[in-house]
Amino acid sequence: MLYSTYDLTAHLTPGTPAALGIALGNGWWSCGPPPGTSQPACGAAPPQLRLQLQVDGKPVLLSDASWRAAASAITYNSLYNGEHYDARTAAALAGWAAPGFDDAAWAHAVAATSAASAAQMSSALMEPTRHVSVRAPRSAHVPAGDAGAQVFDFGQNMAGVVRLTGLRCVAGANVTLRHAELLTHPPYGAEDGSLYVGNLRGAQATDVYTCRGDANGEDYTPHFTQHGFRYVEVRGAAVPLTDEQVAALEMHTDVQQHSSLAFSSARLNQLQHLVLWGQKSNIMSGVPTDCPQRDERRGWTGDVALTAEEAVLNYGMGAVYSRWLKQFADDQATDGGSNNFVPALGTADGSPNWQSAYPAIVWALYTYYGDRGAAEAHHNSLARYYDHLEQLYRASANLTAYAIGFGDWVPAGPMGNKHLIGAFALLRDLQMGADFFGGSRAAGALAQAARCRALLAAAAADFHVAFFDVAKGYYGSGLQTEQVLPLRLGIVPEPLRPKVLAHTIDDIVYTHSRHITSAIRTLTSTPTLSLAPAPAPTPAPSLYPHPYSSPCS
């Protein structure tokens, strides 16, 4: 269990009374996704506080049953579904965190007895998650046929919350804020200006503010939730809001961008812009997630296995990744395998290419930051992980029956050979292990590096025998994915490389009209093709009469 440390010195004055008030809400674990998941329902796991106040390094105050507690103005909160805030309760609790407040009617706190209360505490040792920027609306409109709603467009998908200021509403009225990344559009509905929330699935992404009826106006900023959105729909205000009263507060773990990349192409610059925003919007509470908006928002390892290099190049990820790696070690299965998402709900082996996140992060920190610390700190856990890979390899009938898992997730067309795709993960992991074990100073690291190199040589030979079609001159069934993976690994025999590469480029240009997509393929296609001379194309089929151009132009 992670804890945070705060220096309160600047908030204290000698001889002046001081009070400490803390608000607690549901976290990631409790009050989570819709029914059907393994997270507890709202209220089943009440929030807990563990606090120690030190003066000059000596404990002077601990959280115990002498503390007082009461229900707050936040009547409901969920990371996925939003927050409900009753400003009438807040008014009745005015001054609750200030000296002199009368808490005699409050109940005593109850000592926690759950397993979580005995969890080992560890310092977060990473940047905090905070509001990092404020964005004004770019435009606002009223959806067709819905005069009671206002939709504000912030012009950028982001993770965060929306702040309202100077809100005019009658006491007891509810003002709702619904969040979405898109407006309704065909084929999902008419372009009427309403929010499209189909991609949110079970996540409600709705904040509700119950007004106290202050004639001077009311302000609201959600406390214990976060949404992925570009648009917000506000409903229930007695007086329509102006753009100046609405602001988006961008949120993420406060990693700093430490590099920039610019092209002469506006399209490529926009692509890099999307990469930057997509990455930082998915670093929340130190966990790299799959999405900031729908009812998942978990630390899916496959996403990071593909993006760790990008992340460490664009942002200072050392602290976040180092802390997250500890959870990989905590959640490691008994056979050495890693999970499909971390933190995991139990220990189980994940899919090939998803498990690869563990070595991929260690390798990225070592390769781009020169950081040996992760490889050294995780040496034993990584050695068990490579024991697990070796067991999978030995049981795979020379890779022909290697573990499959998800394969090449969401391909634009047929799925490639899953055994081939799984075997790629094995070889990539072995390449990375040979690198970072080779640079580690941990006892036994050089022996681990030698093991990785030996297994890599054997598995590379098996890969070619198992998956290369000699008669047709390509791997597997000829799909792009099946070619770029061995090309990227550098395991295609040199005499065959030009033919495999030519087949790949022809497939990209003609079969898919210069289209490259899907998860694993995207990791490998562009870097592979950018290093290769483009061969002369074969004539394009009439279905795709496009003139040839380099696939990486």
Predicted regions and their residues:
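Active-site-proximal alpha-helical scaffold in enzymes
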Residues: 296
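Active-site core of glycosidic bond-cleaving carbohydrate-active enzymes
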Residues: 19, 28, 299-532, 540, ...
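Extracellular/oxidizing-compartment recognition motifs
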Residues: 1-293, 302-303, 319-320, 339-344, ...
